[in-house]
Amino acid sequence: MIIMYAIGIGDNKEEVLKAYEKLKEEGIEVELIDNPKLLVDKLLDGEIDGAVRGSLSSSKVILYLRERIGKFYRASILKNPFTNGIFLLSPVGIDDISEDKNERIKDKIRIIEFASNFLKNYNIKAKVAVLSGGRLGDLGRNKVVDETIYEAEEIVEHFKGNVDIIHNGILIEEYLKDGYNIIIAVDGITGNLIFRCLGLICKIPGYGAVILSDKNVNFIDTSRNANWERYYNAIKFLIGGDFG
């Protein structure tokens, strides 16, 4: 039997094994791999069609993947609790975008372009919401917040007239209620925290984080603290591109 997909198994073995058994019940054979480099190499060398990080260490898998394919970004696919559609949240990797302001803006612009193309592949029109650190009326209260507001406005201006894009401060709940499907976090730390609050604490369903890159890499990043459903959903998405 040819095995076309693999899941990394490190910490949190029990949840990975639950996903593995559930997939097996459905006739889907998945290889479990405990070596980060082997997981990446098998994917990029064409031995498997898709890979899920599973519960392997991010610092090992992601750094090695970056060595192999160069720069990329990650976008978590989550269910919108208000619309039942999906949305992409990015950046979610703590080192996905630059600490330098100008480079950070360029990174976010690239993320929006990649994420818009990703949704287009599923016949979903991109609606982009850029987060900043406070309400627009908070301008002048905190220098760090002010910078995030100015940065968000600069990004919106870049796409003006070409992309359905909005900046209305920190109000992520309003963006989601209005059906925005690409949420751009202030930085990777903020994005990671949002994902953990929504996905791991509030249990909003998700499919892992896709790779946003100029290369076609069939890899899904997942948290090592996820429950079995996230690993299961990631494999199902790789197989059929179905958001369930």
UniProtKB/Swiss-Prot annotation:
NCBIfam families, alphabetized: methan_mark_4 (TIGR03270)
Family: Belongs to the MtxX family.
EC number(s) stated in the UniProt entry for this protein: 2.1.1.-
Top EC class of this enzyme: transferase
The name this protein goes by in its record: Uncharacterized methyltransferase MJ1371
Organism: Methanocaldococcus jannaschii (strain ATCC 43067 / DSM 2661 / JAL-1 / JCM 10045 / NBRC 100440)
Stored InterPro entries: MeTrfase_MtxX_xsu
Presence of keyword Magnesium: no
Keywords associated with the record: Methyltransferase, Transferase
GO BP term, example: methylation
GO molecular function: methyltransferase activity
